[in-house]
Amino acid sequence: MGGLKATTVLEEKRGWCVSKAILLAACCRALGIPARLGYADVLNHLSTEKLRQRMKTNVFYWHGYTALYLDDRWVKATPAFNIELCEKFGLKPLEFNGRDDSIYHAFDQAGNRHMEYLHDRGQFLEPPIEAMRRTFDEYYPGWPDISDATEADFGGEVADETATR
């Protein structure tokens, strides 16, 4: 289960949306801020060709975000793309003000589709690993075990693909 622990993301200095959401939730909880792990299925129009080939789809099942309890309500935060990835993909960085949900933009800065939220899977205190594993086994055959998943060099893939644009 190492790939789905906050300490693993800290040690490896990289992760994917699910592991980054786990890290953000752990940090918030350590500071006394209630936090939950949220998941949604999203259609990603801007993923890399290499990732689409590995996944055999551009639907990202169980995309992770973090829900934080601030000022008597739950607010969504998406800790996935760093500023470098946003710049390479032509995306406006997500802003978080503590009042409004901060989820992926539907369009990039050029007006192209970026992210479509297809299905909200709910919010949990811990990652629903078995449910995630079943979905990944069904839709991503041959994908590595979800519990040991770490991010491939997505930043490198983006750099390679965007260099030719």
Q: What does each model-identified segment do?
A:
Residues 1-62:
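Active-site neighborhood of thiol-dependent amide/isopeptide-bond enzymes
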Residues 42-165:
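His-Asp-centered catalytic microenvironments across diverse enzyme cores
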